[in-house]
Amino acid sequence: MGFHFCIWIIFLLPPPCKKCLSPPTMNLRPPKSCGNVFYWVLVLNSGLLYKFCQTIKCRANWRPARAPRGWNEATERHQERRTQMETEMGGISTTYWHRLCTCTDRRAEKLVMDGNNCWFHK
């Protein structure tokens, strides 16, 4: 949805007048002959493009810390069960948990320091 939405927004831009296409100056506002409508449509579209096309909002969840490399999933599960049993019986081993932020499509993953949501830049 995001990619098609970006293209759709780009085509919503009205064609600029020739004065608007002049080289940029220190003045950020366009000439009055171009009208304020074009300026605000441009600002709105750039904001929407940034929000919908550049970032993904993801939810943070608590997950057990990953095992060292070289372990397969079966060994990792067995170790987690053993650690949990030792903890319940009063052993010194504990399972450490990370707060990970994973997108629904599993493209990106990172540790979350605070809050429940995090943003990924594509």
Swiss-Prot record:
GO terms for cellular component: extracellular region. Residues 1-20 form the signal peptide. Keywords: Secreted, Signal. It is found in: Secreted. It comes from the Eukaryota. Its main location: secreted. This is Putative uncharacterized protein PKD1L1-AS1. It comes from Homo sapiens (Human).
